[in-house]
Amino acid sequence: VTRDAPNVLLITADQWRADCLSAVGHPLVETRALDVLASEGMLFRNHFAQPSPCGPSRASLLSEMYLMNHRSVYNGTPLDARFANLAREVRAAGLDAVLIGYTDTAVDLRHHAVDDPALTTYASVLPGFRQLIPGSELHYAWGRDLARKGYRLPPRGIGADAFHEWFRSAAVPGGGPTFAPATYPAEDNDTAFTINTAIEFVRHPERRPWFLHTSLLRPHPPFLAPAPYNAMYDADDVPSFVTVGDREAEAAQHPFVAYMMRHHLHKKLLTAELHPDDRAARHQLRATYYYLMREVDDNLGRLFAALRETGDYENTLIIFTTDHGEDMCDHWMLGKLSYFDQSFHIPLIIRPPGSGSQGRRGHRIEAFTESVDVMPTILEACGAAVPLQCDGFALGDFLAGTEPPAWRDAAVWEMDFHEIGSGAPEHEIGMPLDLCCFAAIRDAAYKYVHFPSLPAAFYDLAADPGERRNLADDPRHATIMLAYAQKLLSRRMAHAERSLTGIQLTPHGPIERPRTDRLEPGMS
């Protein structure tokens, strides 16, 4: 990497839905800093995460591999140490891979002693990163900062949710379980603390160009916001929920939907149970989710202002995205473990460095992009080679203002929902452990979801964008559904793990086909 190469700032929020940006017309959420970033760069409207939840999704983002290849299928499933990753690749290119926050990596236990504390958490750091502070979900560094400021902390050893709940003020009558504000002001909260650390880094980097991955916890739970954010939006003004109708009608869509509804709406939200019939509480929960986004955006505005002050703003590749989405009570679900778009459709904003892309700035890219495209985009900007293992493709043509000669016409994603400890899906819906999974393919017209031991799901998105009617059993759609099943199978076959498959040992030594010869992104 030469000194005139750009800096790289990769920002990830956690659990941020694609529709929650004012730049795409959300009626309530205000994201002024991100709107400016989008106006100066490109907003990718059809960007999708590959797996969910956090650990598998970040494994795909940071290794550029589909779930079927990296196989870190759930929070706590080890990520094979043999795979290349973004941190190691940018370090090999001569950059210091700095992390502020977390990567939710479960380490490869084959390379650790049996008593290594790293084997007790899924929140280790991806190998190759130099972590400045841990993520605020672990709260240790932020807790020390609060203590220095004179706050009384909860007892040692308390869990992350309980740590946050310690700072919730008394319930406000009629406000719902997530309305009561934090007892600390906004400038002392975990998001501000993380961004303060990032600002300090960009003001005083050890060398240039630099690489910084800033990983923010919000708007992920706990659903707790300080004043004035806790009352910024009226719960009565939030958009209506996307549902089939009542809970029974929603559950009838598919056995997986019914199972997830049982497990992921009755979940505990800090100290209060969210009862499905408590509409006011659900509205307040959604408003609180929006508060946390506004809070993140305001703090990102401070970070971008600091970059401008240092003179580095124009020489920095800035990427904003997230790990996965959030159902937020649509389809009577909470969290990110459905097959609906709300769990997988996520934001991606990229601001290229310099002024060479003025002609494309402010453009909305409608092509289907995936989380696995982020790593090759960064490596290309750094002048580094993209490893053969990678399933995604650099977005450089889009950023340069040209259309790629070939590009995918659909997005795919996967999820594994087995539970090693409880075995809940095995007991409740009779699914063997290794069959608790699904794969989905979605284009502008249809979505097909395949389960190895449950019926498929199929939606006509043109007629039913809210995914309210599963057409899998409708004989009139059998032919088109089969075509999408074949399309999904073709995509999976084309992307089978191939780190070594393009190499052949010969009497004259190894020969290798370049990655660009191996797979065109237009292949499905």
Residue map of PLM features:
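Short, charged, surface-exposed hinge/linker loops at domain edges
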Residues: 497-515
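A contiguous, mid-protein "functional segment" used to position or interact
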Residues: 478-503
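Residues forming the ATP-binding cleft of Hanks-type serine/threonine protein kinase domains
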Residues: 462
